[in-house]
């Protein structure tokens, strides 16, 4: 990088520029239980040594700047600086390295995902000495975890609220996502819930547009929920999207949802922002609302393998900021998601303690202590033939969400919901009887069609539909 140039002054300060690795590359450092640990995929510019690049990341995401400054002498740089404590090559990538960086906990405001990300994934991602930079994983120390409320309620409380156990929950995104009037929208919600689904959902870009203002949608959806509950005897819900242009408008919508008595609201946490999301999560905890999270915009951040931020980091951040559900990919549907990587961050969402496992992309052991878990939502291009695989991959603590796979049924919305509920119940029963969903899945569905004409019709419509593309996000081998 820049040549070393130093100028002595009468007060002992040495001005000029020095290599980052002299201060920020510390391979002998022993990490502390209170450190936030980060694994960065670093692609240095030609001629920049990996140690210098790693130290540059540590410096620029903590206390460093491009030149030596005299005010360094007014604080304990050794106490507050980030440290690159390890560099390892990436298999099959000659120009990429994994740089491990430790950050002292005092660099971060308590319970503020916004502040954590501003430092760790801030200006450093535009640093000229790096061709590309990707944050692969974070280890959040328990001391920092305990400063967060986390999900509004968590998995067990949600099941208790809904009185639904022993199976995945079923959902449906109302389609077309834009253009319906509030009354027609509410009609579709009712038909899906009446047919056997647990939830219906606003699409992520349904806010308050001219064709359907938010208050009208909330009222018609609440009417649909109560009517379906009365007819089925089951607790139902619709994810009312409270995302808005200002935090004040977002909270106004959440308050109105609570006044209507509905069980759940929704937020687009990346486009809405972490500050707004945490504010909404706190309100939901205090007022008995579940909070569904959509990850719109995530692929802008996480899809490129050499630059950006892996979704497992965004998933951890969401668990800290707060949300009871989050979309996580399907493995088998139309959206990106390799199986082992997906299951890795699904465990990070649901479990209390997750061991380091590089075969699933998990770089650090993570202990969430008492932070509630988040239900992963499998959604995007799935239909009844996928039900065995989804049940086997995601297990009971998940939401399986079929939009087109419900509303595209040839007989209508309610029969589409019936088909999905029958398929799910058949898969759960078969699994509980000891059958292998991975190998017997199609046969289990075919058997169920014999006593469900709705399922038989759905199977016929979607029998040839597959999404067979190579995943962009793959493990390093």
Curated annotation (Swiss-Prot):
Q: What name appears for this protein in its UniProt entry?
A: Ribulose bisphosphate carboxylase large chain
Is this entry keyworded Metal-binding?
A: yes
Q: List residues binding substrate.
A: 123, 173, 177, 295, 327, 379
Q: Name one GO cellular component term.
A: chloroplast
Spell out which residues are annotated as carrying N6,N6,N6-trimethyllysine.
14
| UniProt xrefs under InterPro entries | RuBisCO (IPR033966), RuBisCo_large_chain_AS (IPR020878), RuBisCO_lsu_C (IPR000685), RuBisCO_lsu_C_sf (IPR036376), RuBisCO_lsu_fd_N (IPR017443), RuBisCO_lsu_N_sf (IPR036422), RuBisCO_lsuI (IPR020888)
Quote the HAMAP family the UniProt record gives: RuBisCO_L_type1 (MF_01338)
Q: What is annotated as the active site?
A: 175, 294
| SUPFAM superfamilies membership | RuBisCo, C-terminal domain, RuBisCO, large subunit, small (N-terminal) domain
- Relate the protein's function as given in its record: RuBisCO catalyzes two reactions: the carboxylation of D-ribulose 1,5-bisphosphate, the primary event in carbon dioxide fixation, as well as the oxidative fragmentation of the pentose substrate in the photorespiration process. Both reactions occur simultaneously and in competition at the same active site.
Q: Which PROSITE patterns match?
A: RUBISCO_LARGE
Q: Site annotated as Transition state stabilizer: where?
A: 334
Propeptide spans which residues? 1-2
Which GO BP annotation is one of this protein's?
photorespiration
State the organism of origin.
Carthamus tinctorius
Post-translational modification comment from the UniProt entry? The disulfide bond which can form in the large chain dimeric partners within the hexadecamer appears to be associated with oxidative stress and protein turnover.
Q: Which gene encodes it?
A: rbcL
Which reaction is the catalytic activity of this chain? 2 (2R)-3-phosphoglycerate + 2 H(+) = D-ribulose 1,5-bisphosphate + CO2 + H2O; D-ribulose 1,5-bisphosphate + O2 = 2-phosphoglycolate + (2R)-3-phosphoglycerate + 2 H(+)
